Amino acid sequence: MASTSSSQPEKNRSHVPLCRLGTEPVSRTGAAEEPSGQRECYYYAPATSPHHHHHHHHQHHHHHRLKQHHRHHHHHHRLQHHHHHHQQQHNHQNQQMQHHWPSRLGPIGPWLGAMTAYRLLTISLLIGILCPHHVQGADPKFDPTTRMRLVLVPADAQVNSVIYRLRATDEEFDYPLTFEFVGDASASTVKVESLPCTKYNSVCQANIVLQRRLEPGRYYDFQVSVKDTKGGMTTQLCSITATNFTTPHDLIFPHKPGIIMIPEDAKRGTELDYVIARKNPLFQKPVYLELWGSPLFAIRQKIVSSETTEGTVFLLGPLDFEKQAMYHLTILANDAYAEPGQDSRNIAGMEIVVIVQDVQDQPPVFTSAPPVTKLPPGILPGDKILQVHAEDGDKGNPREVRYGLVSENNPFTSFFDINETSGEIFLMRPLEDIAFITHVGDPVLLTVIAEEVKVGRDEPPALASTVQLAFFLPDRTNSPPYFENDHYVSRVDENAPQGTALTFVDPYVPRVYDDDTGKNGVFSLTLLNNNGTFEISPNVAERSAGFLIRVRDNSMLDYEQQQSVQFQILAQELGPATNLSALVNVTVYINDVNDNAPVFEQPAYSVELPENMTAGTKVVQVLATDPDSGLGGKVRYTAILGYLNTSLNLDAETGLITVSTNKHGFDREVMPEYHLYVEARDMDGEGNRAQVPLIIKLIDVNDETPIFDKDLYEFILTHDLMGFTTTAVIHAEDKDATAPNNEVRYEIINGNYDNQFVLDKVTGELTVREKIHLRSKKNAKTRRRRQAGSDDEDTDIFILTARAYDLGVPVRFSTTTIRVYPPESRKRSVKFVVPGHNPDKAKTEETLSALSGGKVYIHNIRPLSPDEPGAKDIPAGNPGIKERSVVTATVIYDSSSVVDISEIQQRLSHHNNSYAIMPQDTSSTDTQYKAENKVLFWLLILLATLVALTILILLLCCICSWCPLYGAATKRIVNISRTEDDVHLVHREMANGKQTKSVQVAEWMGRRDAWSAEKPPDTRTKPTRWEFHDGREQLDEDVGRGQDIGEGDRRHIQSAEEQQRRVRIKHNRTAKDDLHLNFHNSRTNLINDRDVYMEDVIENRDLAGDREHITRTRVNRQEYARRKQYDSEVRHIDDDSMRRHEIDRGSDIDFNTAHNSLKSKRELFIKDGNVEILQLMTRDKTRDGLNLDDDNIYVNVPLKPAGNLSHPQLLMVDNTGKEILMRRFIEEQPDGKQIIREHYQIVPGATYIQSMPNEVQQGSTLKGDTFPLGKSGPNSIVYSQLEPEVKVIHTQPVQAGEGVSLDQQMQPAVSNQSLTHELEHSLKQQNALLRQILMEKEKLENAYTQHEVALETQSLPGQSMAIGTQTDCDAGTQTEGFDGVLDPEISLAKPSRRRARSENDESMSEDGYEYVRFNPPNSPEGVYWIKRRRTKKRPRQPRKRIVMVEEVKRKIRTPIKEEEEVQERKKRVPPKKPLRETKTSILRKQLSDESRKDQSRNGESQTGNRHRSESDSHNRDMFMEITDSMDELASPGSHSIRKIQVEKYYKHSDGDFDEDDTEYSIDSDGDEIVIRTNYPSRAQENERYRRQERTYAEPENPVDRKRPARKSSPTDSQPEAMPRLSRRDSSKRGSRKQTSSEPPHNRVSISKYESTVTENGRKLMSTSTEIVGSKRSLTDRSYQSETELAGLEHEERNVPKYMEWYYNKKKSSVSGRTSTESSKSQPSSKKKVGAAEKRVSKTRITAQPKDVEEYDETGGRYKPEPAPRKSPPKGSRLLKEDRALNKQHKPKIETDTNHPLLQHSEHRFERENALEVPAAPTKLPHYMYPETPPHAAAGGKESKSGRESKTSKEAKPKPSPIRENEVKVSNSKIYVEHRGTGHPTQKQLNASTLEDDHDSGIAMNSLLNSLGRRNPIAEKKSVFSIAYDDVSRVKKINSGGESPQYS
């Protein structure tokens, strides 16, 4: 072994293995070789370093690897050869070892080689022993030469002496090394002292110190270990024994110094002494000396002989005797002499003592010198004051000290003396002398010097010290203060202002003194007898002070009252034992100031004068006085002021007033008295002025004559000649002011010859005394008249003269003439000149009769000749008068003829001619009027026809399945999505309808609505979120009754009550909803839903207040009626179902509480409005979210029943997952179990995706196919493959929009009964729907593998991504606004409280998003989701997924991006999907692209087309909706305008609206919008549509494009979100608050918008419906619906194309919505999602509002949101928070930042960046992933781009609650992705999706908060469930509750 070891070390050196410390440390006892073998160490040993004894050990072991590598070398090669070879092997085979080698080889190698290796060679045993210490990498090693195997120590070894020196090294230089004993056996005998060691040392050493005497012959065993800084440790066994031997100190140290003396001033380097040490004869090494004990000394050694070494001790540093006078030093001799056999110590020690000698270098030190001394009062000169003492500082040889006083610069030295030797100080002069030159209280300073006495010539110079003493003189006697003067005098002006200072002029000096010092010198100054007039400062002074007196109150300074003021100043000492004071008088003389105005003797002067006074008449004399002195008291009268003042004279000196002229103008008849003012001024007319009233009362004079009102009175006698035809009264008036001057009397003075007439003298009435006899006979009179042509009545006329006189003096009178005519004839022949050539005789007679007041008989009519009288009188400016006719007629009057001027005016006006007055040519005038009226009449007819046509078209659209507005399925579903509640109800109700899935979903959503978000435990209830009673909330009602009500009604659910009512309605209408849902859930009954929605829209508008957009449309009225109906229903629902659900969930109470609790529960729930959305984390992403996704068993049963293949795609992702989510959610929620029960009950048919928030989240993630309809609302997460379900989600957003009222409504919906029933019903329906969905999914998978994939991508992305985002990635997507929504949808059983964002995110992530995007926002899932979504498998079908993703997007920006991903996924998926799905996607894409182009002009058409394409069911619903839209869009122009408006609106919303609107339109918006459109007034609807169009058109660029792109794959999902946006945005584009906070309002707006569209031309409805349908289709088509929704809106003008696509799409994926198709397309994920996908489909539809929006956001903006899904708490928080926030600050919440999810950094990040960082795609929905993968890169970029475009618009508007920002962000990002995907709708979807997702989560919360309402969606988790069926409807919900959901 020795040889081996020796060779091995060489090898080791050569190969320098890095001892990878072997398997285990070598035991000390083990043989050296064995330990080395055991230890696998890689040693660095340079070939030259011989000391690596370890290396051979390492070679032996080398971790087996080294062993094997090196072993052969080991044996065959010499050290160096082997070194190279081995090293090479190591390099190749053991790179790890090599890594360590270089570092170790470099430094340690050489050292080891030099020292250790050398010793190893010499002593192989030592080497072996050393090796055993196990080195990990490189453990420290003991120096083999210091191995204490057995140390012999003589028994006389001193205690505390060093008996051995240990050394150790470390190849890795991990110094310092520490030595210590292992165990405590040896602790009492010896101790180990590690010597200082640094990392720069090459060896570390330790001393073994003896602790006690050794017993001879006894063995002491112990173990010593050495550790490096890295923890490597080596131990060695040590043994010592004592020998009976005496240490030969003289042999060891032949010369050793004794005591060394050194002066303290010795210089550095001074040699003190030397020592000689003998070496050990056994060693070759010489002795090595060490000096220990003080750093001031060192030892220098040299070898003087072969046996000895000499060491010289020298000084290193300065010494100071005063500091230390003695040093004990120890000299250690290494390897010193030891007696062989008796002593084997390797070290010997000796001690030396150094004594420092003192040197005279210190001055004296005062030991006694009191610094302060108070001199006693009675001290006299010669008395001793004190004594000082000093000593020499050098204690070694002190010298004597002498004292003295320093007189330099000290005036007091002469007053004192000091004893030179004793230090006593004496007073030399009296204290008074000292006090005379000092200030009182100042100390007397004295400096004393102490100097050493030098007694030898050679001594150092004497040193001196000084000290300063202070003496205080005794206190003086106290004296009082005193003033400079004994009195003071000053002057001040009267009324001097406050603060005026009194000035004292010579000889008065205002100073006060006190000669005392200290406290006795402090005194106060106060004023006595001052009455507060003055104040003095300072109040307190010391020694001396000047004082200042100021005016404080000038009320006493009145010269007129007193000319002077006297007071005293008191100065009083404030000392503790003194009250000495001084008092001085002050007299202040007051200077008079002209401060008084003149005062008149009387307050007013009144005089009575006759009105006829003459010049010079004295009026009055005034007198004023002034108390001021001098000129100030001299008054002049300066002016008379007032009316007629120039008629008076005023004497300036005397004040006499006289009349200045006869024409003075004073007239009693004008006014009874005149008021003037007389002014007086002092200062001789230039100073203060005063005025006094002068009243001149006039005395009336009889200067007025009675005047008759007529100069001639004419009266006609009656036929009986006994009276007059009218009362005959004459009247005269006298203007005099008073009686009797104005009393009038009458008399006849002439003409009353026969005294036949009597005149009453007072009244002036003329009467007949007796029957009058006419003078001439009637015949003659008549004859004469006829012949002369004039009356010969002179003979029959009586002419009287009457006089009127007054009673004044003198009497004044006037006269008048009275003519009395005989009885009048009743016939008269009159010629009338009338306009016209040949007037109609009968009409002319009528007109003339009216004119004349008699009966007119026309004799003849002839033209008027120019020369006839009257011909020239015709006005010149009347061109029509050229032709006139003369009508000769007889006018017969009866006894009383009446002329009605108004009738004449009417007749004339009828002819529109001034000539018509004449009975001339009435025919011409009549003709003109008739013509004008005809034009108006036909215009009205045309308008009525257009209206009827619009209504018919809307009806047809609703009826015809091929119509994108098809109301039965598509539109119905749209309604559902729009009103999440309605949608959910519709799904439930649809259980018996088209498809159990859709119906169940609707019902389920309704139930969800009923239990509202606040009931988090009831997943059903929560997903239902019926509380969104806004138009969006109408989902419940609208789904059930939403088909009837229409989207408008759904949107209309503004208040919680309404929403709850709607929930109830939805329940009531369950059968209808089911039928509709089966048909296409929302879309099937789109018309009905539209009606409902319209109704809702009106109510919502009323509730929201901003629903004006909806009212704008004609549909508004219809919607309003429907809304009222719906509202009443809804209210019932609200009260029972929703309230019960909320109560059960506790959401009504826990609207915010739930949010918190959810948050605490890992923030699994987002509180959206009243809904608590469970933020599901994707399985891979979120702890709960993942489970939730997996657990989201409740895939949205195909919202689109058989009609939508997508529905089957609503795979039950994981029943277990869903249930787990539900359980988790329930556990987390106080009412969790109940919630689950209620949720399941509520949404039996539909997948209980929402049942548990956790489940919901998982559901989203789980289902690639499931569409968490994020759009629906936080809790309305319905995993619907059909977009209609998404509409349900929209319904919740609507509620969110109308959050305040919705929340309230939602709370009522929480009723336990309703909740339980609805939950049970929903569970049943959901189960049925789930089965249907699974069946449909299978069909879709079979028929449309690619389509299914697309559907998966579309529906699942929305749901799965949303869910994933919520839980993980999906949670991120949904986290935004509707994590809860999506999640709830996914796990309907869950109360998808936070589902809105998280779930949407999750769904989106899974389906269409790559997790990439989701990751950044809230969790890795976001990233993955987004990537998945990006997958371009099904660009278009993935869009359907995008619908879900949109929901997710709404929740999280990441989800939006994910939506883009979903788009790409959908693109990828489409291959999987049947061609039809792909085709639909392509159509959508094209439509989207076209929409981008045409959206401005035909946004509505695009929407309609999109809806049409969505699915047959969707088409029907959409057709109905489109019909409505078309009605609204009656004219292309209006449509184009609307489209533009919509697009603009979207843009305005920063894409949020676009997203929302598009989503709303396509998925939920379409239906809901249409319904809402119908519901609100047409104008509102138009407005809404315009907004939508604007949104569509505008977003065309930012949002629509995104949507279109998304449309291809995520677009379907996205449109849903966009329609939501549409709804919300239209209403609140400007105010994103509405969008997010007022889902109802926005929804109403959108609804209005769509309604408007509907009214304008079915186009809007088509747009809405298309959007809805698109949304549904999206679900079916991988979110194509959403994208298409955007696309539809964009392609509104391309409606036909889009509609075709939609129709095709519908055909291809009628059963499954986009998500369903996507699910099929992506069977693997779908199968995983299986049921979940159906659920996803449902959820997708439900979530689509959110999902679409979120998807957009995920894809474009929401993609980042998947991460939010990561944090379900955020989602949950969103639901609660969003509700609360929506209520509180809806606008802000709408902002990305405001969204609760967005508020969470994760959500915001997701929103903004989620696209780029999708969560791990584990949970990615297939539909989402296919398109999402591109999202990872492209999605992220596109999402970002779209998002940036939108974000620039929307992100900048972040203030505008989430909707704008989110829409912008998500739209931009999504748009980019969509563009990449080639889906024009992506942008729109993004906007909508963003908004929708926002609505679901953040937006919804924001909207609700801003509205102060609960987030309808958030409140209605059930709504989300339903939403999956009615994706469009969910979208529409967004319009009402969009903001909350998506924003």
From Swiss-Prot:
Relate the protein's function as given in its record. Cadherins are calcium-dependent cell adhesion proteins. They preferentially interact with themselves in a homophilic manner in connecting cells.
Q: What is this protein called?
A: Cadherin-86C
Looking up Pfam families in the UniProt record yields: Cadherin
Q: Give coiled-coil spans as residue ranges.
A: none
Q: Which Gene Ontology BP terms does the record give? A: calcium-dependent cell-cell adhesion via plasma membrane cell adhesion molecules; cell-cell adhesion; cell-cell adhesion mediated by cadherin; homophilic cell adhesion via plasma membrane adhesion molecules; regulation of cell shape
Residues spanning the membrane: 935-955
Specify where it is mainly localized.
membrane
Basic residues compositional bias, start-end: 50-89, 1426-1442
Q: So which residues have sugars stuck on them? A: 12, 244, 419, 531, 579, 585, 612, 645, 912
Keywords from the UniProt entry: Calcium, Cell adhesion, Cell membrane, Glycoprotein, Membrane, Metal-binding, Repeat, Signal, Transmembrane, Transmembrane helix
Q: Compositional bias (Acidic residues) at which positions?
A: 1552-1568
- Low complexity composition bias: residue spans: 90-100, 1709-1724
Asked if Nucleotide-binding is a keyword of the record, the answer is no
The region called Disordered is annotated at 1-102, 1038-1058, 1390-1442, 1458-1516, 1546-1695, 1707-1895
The record's subcellular location field reads: Cell membrane
Bias type Polar residues, positions: 1633-1667, 1879-1889
Q: Which tissues and organs express this gene's product? A: As cell intercalation proceeds, a row of stigmatophore cells surrounding the spiracular chamber show expression of Cad86C. Expression is regulated by the Abd-B cascade, requiring sal. Expressed in a broad region of the morphogenetic furrow and in clusters of cells posterior to the morphogenetic furrow. Weakly expressed in the epithelium of wing imaginal disks. In eye imaginal disk cells within the morphogenetic furrow, expression is localized to the apical region.
Task: List where Basic and acidic residues composition bias occurs.
Answer: 1047-1058, 1486-1497, 1507-1516, 1580-1602, 1754-1764, 1774-1793, 1800-1810, 1837-1863
Q: Which gene encodes it?
A: Cad86C
Q: Which residues lie on this side of the membrane: Extracellular?
A: 1-934
Signals that turn on the gene? By hedgehog (hh) and dpp signal transduction in the morphogenetic furrow.
What is recorded about the protein's domains?
Three calcium ions are usually bound at the interface of each cadherin domain and rigidify the connections, imparting a strong curvature to the full-length ectodomain.
Read off the CDD domains from this record. Cadherin_repeat
